[in-house]
């Protein structure tokens, strides 16, 4: 049994006061329409048609690479008119119709609507809400059958009291759409062609109307302005947080936790406030993430501690390692078991060996550091000569004294020691002491200048 999908995405979204279409506003780091497309793609439809209008090129660019047919609605004359533009591109099968600005609709709810709607039925997704203001109302007869959908601007006082609303999501066979869409008239306050009129046509043709409901009310919430967008962001994030907590993770405050990608978690983790997850992140068991941390496209193994105000991007933090506070681990780092990237340490494309420590105020770039090394405060690997990047290699058990500069390319041998304040531009053999700084002198005849006093 095949399925076509129509996503309506032609609206301007004037209340967003933006230079991009409403459906390209972002929620959890994805555009609204990407959320919708991701949900319908899981239904494995034969084709997806997106009806565009305002700034159509931007919408097409955002969905580039997906198996989507774009149809341009030159004049925004209503939802019925929009679906009519898509009609020639649909196959002779059931059609699922939904909106590009309703981002939280789940695949499960859509699948239920499609599966329970026969080819000769009209499927309608409705919901009961406490505040139906601004939404189309579902009107039923005395037997409970749906008779029509009335938009709020066209509703009378009695109809405005109805709390069952139209979500705008339908499932109907193309054959019925071919019959009904040309019959829609713009005889309403807005002078638009409402898709909701197909309810009236279905009743007239004695077509059975199949009504289903969403699992959660938030799934059918649309976005018209930035206030609604922010509210929906919190709904999304709270829902994600609850799913994560159900897997055995403690979150200090679910209202101050953001996932902008995918998070795979182990058990007994602790996540403090204002943590942001970007891209694909995996946490092992017993991981502790301090406040104000950002984790992006990284793997954090068991028993790791990421202390507050730290960032880990595109790297692996091995079991029992410690990062932070105020540390930045940039892409392509591998922090081995029990190693320490301490406060105000930045690492980029660096391997920090098992048990090694860089505890304070250090830059490690393009480096390979062995096991059980000590990198003192203020150490800098000088990896860039103005044109190319070069590598620093430090052997196991090496000791790099504070405030030293290692001019790459350079090798520090196993067990070697670099004296504090040294600038090392040549390789240091194993177990040697390297020191390069001016000899200390004491000048016993020196006198401190006397401050001039005001006259």
From Swiss-Prot:
Residues binding Mg(2+): 101, 224
UniProt region (Pyrophosphorylase), positions on chain: 1-226
GO biological process, one term: regulation of cell shape
Pfam families associated with the record: Hexapep, NTP_transf_3
Subcellular location(s) of the protein: Cytoplasm
UniProtKB keywords: Acyltransferase, Cell shape, Cell wall biogenesis/degradation, Cytoplasm, Magnesium, Metal-binding, Multifunctional enzyme, Nucleotidyltransferase, Peptidoglycan synthesis, Repeat, Transferase
Subunit structure of this chain's protein: Homotrimer.
Record-given protein name: Bifunctional protein GlmU
Natural source organism: Francisella tularensis subsp. novicida (strain U112)
Phylogenetic placement of the source organism: Bacteria, Pseudomonadati, Pseudomonadota, Gammaproteobacteria, Thiotrichales
Gene: glmU
